[in-house]
From Swiss-Prot:
Organism: Christiangramia forsetii (strain DSM 17595 / CGMCC 1.15422 / KT0803) (Gramella forsetii)
Protein name (Swiss-Prot/TrEMBL): UPF0173 metal-dependent hydrolase GFO_2312
NCBIfam families the record matches: PRK00685.1
SMART domains named in the record: Lactamase_B (SM00849)
GO MF terms held by the record: hydrolase activity
């Protein structure tokens, strides 16, 4: 499994020969828009955690370019199906075996509305089991006891957690979340994109290190392999 970070909560996963894109927000992100061309991105599937603009902005353009299947909650899937896109609707607690692996849609504590204010269903996260590697992508969320359910069904190799505070968990809660999910290898997301969520990188990594954990703050376009 190859994981590439494109800023905010945008990730590209390469699982075998399948390309999975998560929460594409590039053209509206000052940190990534001059570094990443959405026309170059490959996607067989686009996973959307919720409907906020900083998670869906480029989903339509990329789906048009690639023919990707959009996977999200029932309301978001319906929204895109009505626009003519191929979709796969899910909801909390449900799982599905896709060609790249098993995906479970799990709870997140946040809000979810489209940029026009219309209802975007309930936000969620994804647990993906693919190519003998397991990843939890939390999406935007507060710390929640529901996270303790994840290691009951999946042993994680890595997790992607929001750390920017104000709108989501901050560093301290993310450390607790990593305890809840029993995973010490964390990719940070949802930070530095705008003023409310700027963080001190060295302090954040130090706090994780002091708890025996590894916090990775990847550069735009940087990849890791599991």
């Amino acid at each position: 499994m190859k994981i590439t970070f494109y800023g905010q909560n945008t990730l590209a996963l390469k699982i075998g020969d399948i390309h999975v894109l998560v929460d594409p927000f590039i053209t509206g992100n000052d940190l990534s828009k001059d570094k990443v061309d959405i026309n170059d991105l490959k996607a067989d599937y686009i996973l959307l955690t919720h409907a906020h603009q900083d998670h869906i902005l480029d989903a339509e353009a990329i789906a048009k370019n690639t023919g990707a299947v959009i996977v999200s909650n029932f309301e978001i899937a319906n929204h895109y199906e009505e626009k003519g896109f191929e979709v796969h609707p899910m909801n909390h607690g449900g799982s599905w075996d896709f060609e790249f692996g098993k995906v479970k849609y799990v709870n997140a504590i946040h809000t979810s509305s489209f940029p026009d204010g219309s209802y975007g269903g309930q936000p969620g996260g994804f647990v993906i089991e693919g190519e003998h590697k397991n990843i939890y992508i939390a999406g935007d969320t507060a710390l929640t006891m529901d996270m303790k359910l994840i290691p009951m069904h999946t042993k994680l190799d890595i997790a992607v957690l929001p750390i920017g505070d104000n709108f989501t968990m901050g560093i301290n809660d993310a450390i607790i979340a990593s305890d809840f999910i029993e995973c010490d290898k964390i990719i940070g997301c949802h930070y530095d994109t705008f003023g409310y969520i700027e963080i001190d990188h060295e302090e954040a990594k130090k706090k994780f290190y002091e708890k025996g954990k590894d916090l990775m703050l990847l550069d735009i376009g940087e990849s890791i392999e599991l």
